[in-house]
Amino acid sequence: MYVIKRDGRKEPVQFDKITSRITRLSYGLDPNRIDAVKVTQRIISGVYSGVTTVELDNLAAETCAYMTTVHPDYATLAARIAISNLHKQTTKQFSKVIEDLHDWINPATGKHAPMISDEIYNIVMENKDTLNSAIVYDRDFQYTYFGFKTLERSYLLRLNGEVAERPQHLVMRVALGIHGSDIESVLKTYNLMSLRYFTHASPTLFNAGTPHPQMSSCFLIAMKDDSIEGIYDTLKECAMISKTAGGVGLHINNIRSTGSYIAGTNGTSNGLIPMIRVFNNTARYVDQGGNKRPGAFALFLEPWHADIFDFVDIRKTHGKEEIRARDLFPALWIPDLFMKRVQEDGPWTLFSPSAAPGLDDVWGDEFEELYTRYEREGRGKTIKAQKLWYAILQAQTETGTPFMVYKDACNRKTNQQNLGTIKSSNLCCEIVEYSSPDETAVCNLASIALPAFVEVSEDGKTASYNFERLHEIAKVITHNLNRVIDRNYYPVPEARNSNMKHRPIALGVQGLADTYMMLRLPFESEEAQTLNKQIFETIYHATLEASCELAQKEGKYSTFEGSPASKGILQFDMWNAKPFGMWDWETLRKDIVKHGLRNSLTMAPMPTASTSQILGYNECFEPVTSNMYSRRVLSGEFQVVNPYLLRDLVDLGIWDDSMKQYLITQNGSIQGLPNVPQELKELYKTVWEISQKTIINMAADRAIYIDQSHSLNLFLQAPSMGKITSMHFYGWKKGLKTGMYYLRTQAASAAIQFTIDQEVADQAATHIASVSELDRPVYVPKGTKFSEQKAASALTESSDNEKDASPVPSEQSSVSSAMSNVKLEDSVAPAVPTETIKEDSDEKKCDIYNEKVIACTAPTPEACESCSG
């Protein structure tokens, strides 16, 4: 057999040469776990005569990726082989790569089609020696295999279909796209991003430095008018934004309902659904930048709208096709009054906005007053509130939607109160900003890699968390996101108008679960809950401090006066809570009142679905969904085991093929293994094994530092009306803005596992550990310089105030009393209202407290999202 070299020469396949290359790339890995000869044997078995060296490297990388379930170091080795292969195929010098991308001629048209803007090209040419020498290519080898494949698939720029960028080139391009000719800031951003302290959001990675640098992730659009002109102007705006990789949140409360009178034609309206289907087809047609990812719109509607029942069902897999829009995401913008009526089993009146104008323009007491006046005037149709609630829960169990966002909490606890009523969130329900027909709200995102701040002592005995460094990095990101506002390409003028006036930004996080596992803190532990508060207090303080410093240099944002912050009111003040005590808030508060802020909003933890894959961490602030899962790449599907768990089981001496097969049969859970220490069972609980009450409590703990909102998913193995009702009401009473992004449920029935030998899997429970305990660093809590100076008094005061300032009402409603002492996944529901329901038979079926697991209503359950997991 022979291999074809990159220069076209033929050379015999040499076993020793492959082994030598594998060994060379295994530096720093565990020599007792990495078997270069075994890897080479597997590679040779897949080689054919005439294979190219590129194909050989790809085969080697895939072979190591498949062996990740043997030891986590194989994942590192797979990445090194793949990245080494890319380095051989690409130009090393950054300035030359930029030149090639800028000078590209499209072979199909023969025309100049630059992928890099003239501005960035000129900056690189003027500073090429500095920039070329600053790049550290060894940092490419820190990516995981699947992180690198994610970059390769969607993020690295290509020439003639072939990848032209290296990961370090991308990072430098992003830094230049943000900071332009400010080379000092460019190098600072490059170094921190390449060292994996943080990442900017996908649109920034896609588009920074290109001729149309649309770097914003989120756009909140107002339906311009209830007319053909207004609807289609809005549709065009959505298409223009989606074309440049923006996600869309659109509120449609002002569109009249089915059967409403149309004066212009003397006819009646077809209602929301036919219009929604037009938006659905636009989302399908306009992908985000050449199939990098599909277009995505979320539609927000308040539950008083007369078409609400059809709206919540638009993603169902069954029913008439003409009333479905499965590529859109329905979301509810819920006033407190609706939740009260459901809780009381009271009436709820549905209106057409043409008959009951202005309901979406007011919130709180003003909304209640206007809504009840319209009810008294008989302008709508009255139903039981629980009938609508039942329909919402039924849709959520089948499709995971509609999303739940609480209108009054969003408007009551925002620094944009002085702008007007906020009417929607964004696609992922973490951005909460004011929008109007002439202002499309925009937000630029970045996420901090929380595991980067875990520090282990030199002797390996203790581990701690570096809050000072976290604070420092969060300030750098704030400066970056603020600069994106000025350097961004805006696809529509309404977006530029809004962003330049209010200048909101959004910092998020990724890898909170990884951080807990590195520090050996179970997700439900008190230490983990304390660290959760400390991390988010630190980031919030850093963003405000940086924004205040920017205001002193560049001026406050134009609508600062009249905002809560201008009066010294910060996010935790709006919750009637006091901060944990890590930082000096009083000095910062005075500085903000005196100098202002450069940005109206700064915090919004987002899902980080793609970027967390790049850095190799768990998404945002969520627990792990499984300790074993599949990763799909173009070449196939790979099994991946939680690397922290895998390392522990390997070191205990109980990891082998039977343990792997056991994990597959148990959907990644280790709770049923008698030979695994209880300490590990607690540490590696999946989200399905963690109390949802804990998830919501931790969300509320961090929410007092989040001036927008955060994308909170809820998880239930066996959803029932009672459980979902309990979760929603608990979150609402805790004061959350986003009550639920997706409802995640497990498959109703497990797929037949043809590849599993059950006898082999059963052997996993019989293994005996070779060591009695693992040698792992012990977490030592640390504060900041400020908190250490005032440790005793600050922590005691914080603890007392948090108890006093709990946003949960003290009165015991049927819902809150049931929630006080139970886990949300337990089969204990709020009490059924005592009054007799004197309605028609349809109303009697709507038992929102039923504990029976909800059965799928789809005629073909295999097509249902919930049933298929």
Swiss-Prot record:
Name under which the protein is recorded: Ribonucleoside-diphosphate reductase large chain 2
Top-tier EC class: oxidoreductase
Residues reported in the UniProt entry to bind GDP: S202, S217, N426, E430, T608, A609, S610, T611
Organism this protein belongs to: Saccharomyces cerevisiae (strain ATCC 204508 / S288c) (Baker's yeast)
Principal location: cytoplasm
Alphabetic keyword roster: Allosteric enzyme, ATP-binding, Cytoplasm, Deoxyribonucleotide synthesis, Disulfide bond, Isopeptide bond, Nucleotide-binding, Oxidoreductase, Phosphoprotein, Ubl conjugation
Chain intervals with Low complexity compositional bias: 806-820
E.C. designation(s): 1.17.4.1
One Pfam family here: Ribonuc_red_lgN
Region (Disordered), start-end ranges: 793-843
GO molecular function: ATP binding; ribonucleoside-diphosphate reductase activity, thioredoxin disulfide as acceptor
Binding annotation for ATP: K5, R6, E11, P12, V13, Q14, F15, D16, K17, T53, D57
Native organism taxonomy: Eukaryota, Fungi, Dikarya, Ascomycota, Saccharomycotina
Domain ATP-cone: 1-92
Active site positions: N426, C428, E430
Induction: Highly induced by DNA-damage.
Keyword Zinc: no
Highest taxon above the source species: Eukaryota
One GO-annotated biological process of the protein: deoxyribonucleotide biosynthetic process
InterPro entries: ATP-cone_dom, NrdE_NrdA_C, RNR_lg_C, RNR_lsu_N, RNR_R1-su_N, Rrm1
Oligomeric and partner information: Heterotetramer of two large (R1) and two small (R2) subunits. S.cerevisiae has two different R1 subunits (RNR1 and RNR3) and two different R2 subunits (RNR2 and RNR4). The functional form of the small subunits is a RNR2-RNR4 heterodimer, where RNR2 provides the iron-radical center and RNR4 is required for proper folding of RNR2 and assembly with the large subunits. Under normal growth conditions, the active form of the large subunits is a homodimer of the constitutively expressed RNR1.
NAD keyword on record: no
